[in-house]
Amino acid sequence: ALGPLLAILATIFLVPRIKHDKEAAHTPTTHVLDFRPVLRCRAAMAYVLGYTVHNFELFAFRAWTVAFLVYAASLDDDINLPISIIMLAAIVNLFGVPASILGNEFALKLGRHRWITLIMLTSSVLACMIGFSTAWSIWLVIGLCCLYSMTITADSAALTAGAVEAAPPGYLGATMAVHSSIAFTGSFLGPLVFGIMLDVNSS
């Protein structure tokens, strides 16, 4: 719970102040709540839609990690876990935090499009593997989930940075509003669709 407070203090005292060139600053050509320039910007919307898919996958995984690990553990006769499944699920999700930060650093070195494509393809392969991994050792399943947690989030910062970079001049705030509003619809739909698929295919 102290995270936001620490972030505010870090921003105030640690982030250097930047002097903006008023002459170079862009002002919107329409009113502040006009999102049409953003919606017409194909480059920015590509990142927005990519982030939507990212959130769909991320929140589906987070919402169902505990249930999945409980099911996988129930199939392992030799299971001897030192901590609870809930704690394991929390640890699995924590692997994604540094992956998001480091992912953008790799994107800067390798190229943003190349990095995002590589991570999304890798994440898709891991998702398919994990879906069929429940009969394996629970420790192997947990290891795959940790790796999957990292690949899910490794493109997060790169997608947001890409949207910022591609924002139409004067519409950075509007671009971020569209970015968040549309993308977090995917956050709502991911767990919902996952649950529906379980119900549809349950025996």
Describe each region flagged by the PLM.
Residues L121-A135:
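C-terminal ends and interior cores of transmembrane alpha-helices
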Residues A43-V97, G190:
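Extracytoplasmic gate region of multi-pass secondary transporters
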Residues A154-A167:
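Intracellular juxtamembrane helix-capping segments at the cytosolic ends
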